[in-house]
Every structure is written in C-alpha cells, then in structure tokens.
Amino acid sequence: MTNKNTGKDIRQNSPKEHQSGQPEPLSGSKKVKNRNHTRQKHNSHHDM
C-alpha cells in the first residue's frame, strides 16, 4: 500500500509540475527572445 501510494503521488506530482514549469519558461523565453530580437533590430534602425 505504501509503495503504490508513493508511486502514484510522485507520478501525479511529476507531470503537473513539469507541465506547469516547462511550457511557461520555454514559451516565455522563446517569445521574449524572439520579440526582443525583432524589437531591438527595429528600434536600432529607427533610433539610428
């Protein structure tokens, strides 16, 4: 009983934390990097 409960608890906690932590930082980092790069290039040209 203890072994089954521990396995289920860890399994349910793993996907929940991974799903909430992986897509957020990955999407945010990619979106921010892409947006920052395009904005900086555009801003640099306009500023200069």
From Swiss-Prot:
It holds the Pfam family SspP. Keywords: Sporulation. GO terms for biological process: asexual sporulation; sporulation resulting in formation of a cellular spore. Residues 1-48 are annotated as: Disordered. Induction: Expressed only in the forespore compartment of sporulating cells. It is found in: Spore core. Its main location: other. InterPro entries: SASP_SspP. Residues 30-48 have a biased composition (Basic residues). Residues 1-19 have a biased composition (Basic and acidic residues). Belongs to the SspP family. This is Small, acid-soluble spore protein P. The lineage of its organism: Bacteria, Bacillati, Bacillota, Bacilli, Bacillales. The gene is sspP.
